[in-house]
């Protein structure tokens, strides 16, 4: 039995995903055949990048489970996508609240 309260949030465009202090535990995203970049920042759109992922040149989906206690985002989690090629982003997180 887990002692944590893992939550999820899903977005389809650049947006604030989580408000408040949170730990990112996992990411799942879907994309089309053109490479694009997904950036997760702490502190809003102009905040500090904590994780950057690039999609391959093939349509599909990618997932990343972050080990141990995850990545700490002190001031929420903001999703930034470089283009509409990234069609959906789902975050698994602990703490904070979905935006």
Give the residues covered by each predicted segment.
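Noncatalytic modules at the cell exterior or secretory-pathway interfaces
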Residues: 25-27, 70-84
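Surface-exposed coil/turn segments at beta-strand junctions on protein surfaces, enriched
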Residues: 19-20, 57-59, 72, 84
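A short, sequence-level motif marking secondary-structure junctions
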Residues: 54-59, 95-96
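Short, surface-exposed beta-strand/strand-loop-strand elements in extracellular ectodomains
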Residues: 33-53, 91-92
């Amino acid at each position: 039995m887990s002692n944590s309260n893992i939550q999820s949030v899903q977005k389809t465009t650049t947006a604030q995903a989580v408000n408040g202090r949170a730990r990112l535990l996992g990411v799942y995203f879907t994309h089309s055949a053109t490479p694009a970049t997904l950036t997760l920042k702490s502190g809003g759109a102009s905040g500090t990048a904590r994780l950057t992922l690039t999609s391959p040149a093939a349509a599909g989906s990618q997932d990343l489970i972050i080990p141990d206690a995850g990545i700490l985002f002190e001031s929420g989690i903001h999703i930034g996508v470089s283009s509409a090629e990234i069609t959906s982003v789902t975050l698994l997180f602990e703490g904070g609240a979905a935006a």
